[in-house]
Every structure is written in structure tokens, then in C-alpha cells.
Amino acid sequence: AIEQKKTEKVQIEKDKNLKETSLEKLKLKEQQLSAQLKEDERKKQELKRKVDVAIREEINKAKQREINRQKEKQRKKEEAKKGKSTQNTKTKNVKNDVAVNTKKVVTAESSEGSATGKNFANNKGRLPWPVNNGQITERYGRNSHPTLPGVSTVNNGIDITCSSGSKVRAVFEGEVSSVFSIPGSGKVVIIKHGGYMTVYSNLQEVYVSQGSKVSLKQSVGSLVNEGGVSSCHFEIHLISNGLPETLNPSLWLGGR
């Protein structure tokens, strides 16, 4: 009986040590997850900051282009008026024709962006995915952490987990507005489509440069390899009244 009690006591101590070890491992894992979450959040905030800066720079450039266009329009208008008062009828007619033709060209160029934006808007719910395959693993807006209770993150776009090194493609025709890198998060491409902009990040390689014209489904880069898989981060922004606004990409994407 004494030996049995000794054996039971030893077993109890073993069970206690095992529980303590398991608890320590669990705490360590939680600490590691928390540290990883903080690092991921830091990368997200850096991405948000750089995307916001890039989009606002593009907005300011567009405003300046419009100011310059209006100035040029006014200058030509004043030149045409001056020509009417100093030249004969034939010369005046020639100058009027030139002024009218120039005006048509400027109007066509200035309306190109708005036409592209309108076409983009008309394709809501029908845009192709930025990658050929994969599943959405983090949705737009607030997301609960899968393993840390009570912890959530906010996503300005969506994350699509797909095959390692997958190619990323433009969801609509447009012009590359920005290309930049974020340490630890790969490279980022921003494409403007009139009053809309799309963001593609976590790229290892980039196939386009700032100012490049891109077509529908054109490859813009390939994704970083993350342990045998890749994750494509994708955002859509609307420029409204000179300010950027994030949109839910899931409402805009259709078939592959």
C-alpha cells in the first residue's frame, strides 16, 4: 500500500509538471503570436501610410494638371481675341479654326480619365480577380484573429492566399501611378483608372513602371513566396471630392 501511494505521488508530480510545461508552451506560443501580430500590424500601417501618400500625390498632380489645362485654355482664348482685333478677316478665321481644333483636343484629353473611371464603375461586380487562383483569407474591414480571442485587425482591402509565386494582374485597363517597396512586405503597384485606383502589394517582382499603360489582365508582377504559398493584398480606392475612400473589393470582383 505504501509503495502504491509512492507511485501515485510520483505520477501526480509528473502530471503536474506536464501541465506546467504545457501551460508554459501555450503562453510562449501566445507571446509569439502576439509578437507576429504586432509585426504584421506594423507592416499594414506602413502600407496604409505609403498608399495614402502615393494616392494623395496623384490627386495633387491631377489638380495641377487641371490648373495648367485651364490656364492654357485661357491663354489660347485670349490669343484668339487678340488676333480678332489685329488681323484681317481671313487671318481671324484661320486663328478661330486653330483655337476651336485645339479646344477639341484638350477636351478629349481631359475627359479620357473620367471616361476610364466611368467604365471602371460600370464593371462593378464583374472585374476579374487579381490572381488566377486562391481563396480570400482576410476580408475587407474588421477581422477577428483566428487564434487570439478578443483580438481583431482592420483591412483596407482583401488578402488572397494562392500558389507560391503567382502572377498578379491588373483588374482593369489603366496607367501605373506608383511603384514602391515596403521592407518585409515586398513591392507595391498602384494603377489609376480615372477616378478609381487599385493597389497590388506583397510583390517579389514588378513588370511595370510608373507611367506605364496597362491592359485588362496584364501581369504587373509576381508574389513573394511565404513558406510554399503566397498572399496577394488587393485594394480599391475611389477618389471623391479630392479625397481617397477605400471600397470593398469583394463587391467589385466577379469571375476569374
Language model segments and positions:
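Terminal peptide-recognition signature
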Residues: L26, I136, I160, G174, ...
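Residue-level recognition of beta-strand microenvironments
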Residues: R139, V179-F180, L223
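Zn2+-dependent peptidoglycan hydrolase active-site motif and core
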Residues: T153, A170-E205
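Conserved, short, structured surface segments that act as functional micro-motifs
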Residues: V189-K192, Q210-R256
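Short glycine/threonine/proline-enriched tight-turn/helix- or strand-capping micro-motif at secondary-structure
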Residues: V105-K124, T137-A170, H193, S231, ...
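Short, well-structured beta-strand-loop connectors
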Residues: E8, V168-E175, V208-S222
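Long, low-complexity, acidic/serine-threonine-proline-glutamine-glycine-rich intrinsically disordered tracts
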Residues: I67-N132, E138, R142
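Alpha-helical oligomerization segments with coiled-coil/rod-like character
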Residues: A1-V94
